Curated annotation (Swiss-Prot):
Function comment: Transcription factor that may regulate the expression of the gene cluster that mediates the biosynthesis of psilocybin, a psychotropic tryptamine-derived natural product.
Disulfide bridge map: none
Organism lineage string: Eukaryota, Fungi, Dikarya, Basidiomycota, Agaricomycotina
Helix-loop-helix motif: annotated span: 213-249
Coiled-coil region list: 264-306
Pfam hit, one: HLH
Subcellular location: Nucleus
Name assigned to this protein: Psilocybin cluster transcription regulator
């Protein structure tokens, strides 16, 4: 808080300066701006603090110089009001850290402070109201005058509210919406209006048209797939033939499954019988091979015996030729008889085995 210093009271500052006669009122100024600004009371500041605040405003007094404390007069006050009128409103120009008082900074507007004026502090709210009336009308962008829908109006209102709260950035109008057709265009219509009802009916008709088109395409495809003898084109006849054809296919599938199952069982049984017969043939062939091997061994023994008998015959040269021939004839006959008997036995066994196999 700045120390209380004596200052000369100026009646013009307490009662406010009259508006300039030649300055016309702005056409687009808000109707309640003067009343809102006039309601602001700076009862806790003296003249020195007010001058310090005016000096600290950025860009407010670029064209003139603020007189020092104690040297102000009516002309200086008028110059100050003129500079204030040419600048932006106080709420938009002053940064946020100048609007609210805090510890270690400038005092706030509503903070109480010492007053050295005998008749109270000057009414700066009236001076601000006069400055707002003398301010030029802001130039509006053409895009801001166009009608928006409910969502865009809400966005513009929030943007303007944030600008009034102290945002120094330049206002950028939202981009114009692209022209919409079809269902998106129907959303902009007010609910319950004739336009909304008409768009809703159009959308319903479009949905129904697509549904009927899909149904017709499906029925035509069935008519091409299902065989038809009479060539009927009616939708009901096509559907009836399709149902009958589906039942016929299901019956054929069931019969085919039953036939395939029976054939598989018969094939398995036949394979089992063939396998058993193959095993029996293998067993008989093995027995025949063993019998043949045995007969060949016996025949070899008999041949050896005949060779031994033939070598011992010329040992006695004194024997008569008749006796020698008789013995050799007897031995040959015995060998022949043995061979024939063994051959007959082998053939008998072979015939018996063949009969059993058949």
């Amino acid at each position: 808080m700045a120390p209380a210093t004596p200052a000369t009271h100026d009646p013009a500052l307490s009662h406010g300066a009259p508006p300039a006669p030649g300055a016309p009122a702005p056409a687009n100024a808000p109707p309640n701006a003067s009343g809102d600004i006039a309601g602001m009371q700076l009862s806790g500041l003296d003249q020195s603090q007010i001058m310090n605040l005016l000096r600290s405003l950025p860009g407010m007094f670029s064209g003139g110089k603020i007189p020092d404390q104690g040297q102000g007069n009516k002309e200086d006050a008028a110059q100050t009001l003129s500079n204030l009128a040419q600048a932006q409103p106080y709420g938009q120009q002053l940064p946020l850290h100048y609007q609210a008082g805090g510890p270690g900074g400038l005092p706030g507007i509503n903070d109480p402070g010492p007053s050295t004026h005998p008749r109270g502090p000057p009414n700066l709210g009236q001076l601000s109201a006069v400055a707002m009336q003398a301010a030029p009308a802001p130039i509006q962008h053409p895009d801001q005058q166009t009608n928006r829908n409910d969502g865009e109006q809400a966005g513009n209102a929030s943007a303007s509210t944030s600008g009034k709260d102290g945002d120094n950035a330049e206002f950028v109008p939202p981009p114009a919406p692209a022209p919409t057709t079809g269902r998106r265009g129907g959303r902009s219509a007010t609910m319950g209006s004739d336009e909304w009802s008409r768009q809703r009916k159009d959308n319903h008709k479009e949905v129904e048209r697509r549904r009927r088109g899909n149904i017709n395409e499906g029925i035509n495809e069935l008519g091409r797939i299902v065989p038809s003898g009479s060539g009927e084109k009616a939708k009901g006849a096509i559907l009836s033939r399709a149902v009958q054809y589906i039942h016929h296919l299901k019956e054929n599938e069931a019969r085919n499954i039953e036939k395939w199952t029976l054939e598989k069982l018969l094939m398995d049984q036949a394979m089992g019988d063939l396998q058993a017969q193959l095993e029996e043939v293998k067993r008989l062939w093995e027995e025949e091979r063993m019998a043949r091997t045995r007969l060949e061994a016996e025949l070899e023994v008999l041949r050896n015996m005949n060779g031994v008998n033939a070598g011992s015959a010329p040992a006695s040269k004194d024997e008569s030729a008749a006796g020698t021939k008789r013995r050799s004839t007897d031995g040959a006959e015995a060998a022949t008889a043995a061979t024939e008997s063994s051959t007959a036995n082998a053939e008998g066994e072979r015939d018996g085995k063949r009969q059993r196999t058949e």
